[in-house]
Amino acid sequence: MWEGFTAAETQALWLSLRVALVAVAAALPPAVATAWLLARYNFPGKALVDSLVHLPLVLPPVVMGYLLLIALGTTAPLGGWLWETFGLRFAFSWTGAALASAIITFPFQVRAIRLSMEAIDPGLSQAAETLGAGPLDRFVNVVLPLALPGIIAGAITAYAASLGEFGAIITFVSNIPGETRTLPLAIYTAIQTPGGEAAAARLAALSIALAVGGLVLSEVAAARVRRLSGR
Amino acid sequence: MTLSARIDHRFPGFRLEMEFSVRHPGLTAIFGPSGSGKSTTVNAISGLLRPDCGRIEIHGTPVFDSATGLDLPARRRRIGYVFQDARLFPHLSVRGNLEFGARRSPEPPTSAEQGRIVEMLGIGHLLGRRPATLSGGERQRVALGRALLMKPRLLLLDEPLAALDQARKAEILPHLERLRDEARVPIVLVSHALDDVARLADEIVVINEGRSVAAGPVDEILSRLDLLSLTGQSEPMSVIVADVLHHDVQGGLTELGFNGGRLWVARVDADPGAQVRLRIAARDVMLAVERPSGISATNLVPGHVTEINAGPGAYCDIRLDCGGSILLARITRRSAERLGLGPGREVIAVIKSVSVNRQAAAAPALNLPAG
């Protein structure tokens, strides 16, 4: 199956999958917390939080990459501190690509989870409360299972979007083969290279297959969970 | 004291000022029209709503006291709450729902107790099902079981029958009767349906516009003529507790005894000595000033008039004392004048029809044979 692909191309594919997986997993907990906050609570500055969450949707990805670069570059105060204190380096590293993807796709997760949380009858939490369940107990055993269709849909959408992230990654962590050259960057590189049209076509076909597969998977998973959760 | 509550709470445009207590361990109904503050009252008792001011005590232990700042969270009050819409967890099976409260109870039910409750509610065959596949009546029974399995100190039922059609209601009423008689948990039932209250309640707290206006035993409250308009009773009725004396198997009849006399009704499915609850609509009671002869009705109960109230249109409502039991009759004002009725006057009540419910288990409403 891999015969048509060069080693560098399969490397780009696996890197893409890994970056997207880490991005989605890292963004999931804060996305669940943010969605719950926005779905159930009213507080001063809620509109501001809502706008911040959605900012990556409207901001050009290149700008997002630029902002990350000036905040987390090894010479920037925050980036330097992380590097010296924890040995954590985002700039020009695949972890930086994951971070950029996580931020860019954060709104997809929050929106899907928030929608499913808003659809939960608050009376169910009250019922759980009268049955002896505390706040964390109610969240884990009532809210999370009922929000699962939204969590899965959000994660899969975010995963698919992560696979396609280009602007923020190339701006923040550059285009380093084997480190930050994900599929979109590899396609871009192939197009820039004389005689690379065939490689670009192969990688593009791969991207399309991944995207379609992700969407189908998302629908199947959401339908199954809805059935299991009795809704 | 099972429950004592003083609740003062303001909403925009509405103020609840309830004060009542429940001494009786059986079923107490909080009865009143929609919007009178019934649900707010039980929400405050359960701990789901924090009143502005007041004090709530359960079995002598305060759970809320605005004077000392005490406000026990709902999850620590151990009050079972059955909501009008059941509120079963859709992601859990019936078994998972039943276990939800049981697992969190400081005093988990034994498997024998679990089995007894499941059997009493007739939900054993539903354990593997999802709530979405249950009928309305089944959902309410599971919700009842879920609340009972946490071994509550008090059970609150907020209009558990209101969302059900007549058939579903008939299906769940016997279970509520059994619960009242067997579960040994004091029950507070919120309802605006007089029929349900008359059938189920031992005591009634009448609430109107956010205030408790009357409280007492069901027979006394429902026969109080001054409360008729408040309780929304278009048709006044008397509630009488009677004993099964014996059956006339050939005639298909049962003789009942109460402290006002004896009544023959169509055969009741209960052993002699069992208690039954009778509901007699005031319009099914005729009055005679001397013992009538040659009529088809067999149930003649002597008594004397204690009160006469104007009823709707041409009618008036007459309250009788029959050996200590209260009986209401609705007759025309013209008849009352013709008979010269007034307080103290001895009369014979001719009872045309009686609804019988067993105190302990299911029985459909029965009617008298002869009218």
Predicted regions and their residues:
Chain A
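Interhelical loop and adjacent transmembrane-helix boundary motif
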Residues: M1-A8, F172-V212
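Transmembrane alpha-helix signature in integral membrane proteins
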Residues: E9-L38, L57, A102, A155
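Transmembrane-helix boundary motif in ABC transporter permease subunits
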Residues: V22-V53, Y66-L68, S116-E118, G123, ...
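Transmembrane alpha-helices
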Residues: A25, V110-I113, M117, D121, ...
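C-terminal transmembrane helix and the adjacent membrane-cytosol boundary/short C-terminal tail
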Residues: G45, P107, R111-S125, E129-A133, ...
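Transmembrane alpha-helices and adjacent helix-loop boundaries
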Residues: L59-G65
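Membrane-interfacial helix termini and adjacent extracytoplasmic/periplasmic loops
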Residues: G65-A102, F172-P177
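Non-cytoplasmic
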Residues: G73-T74, I151-T189
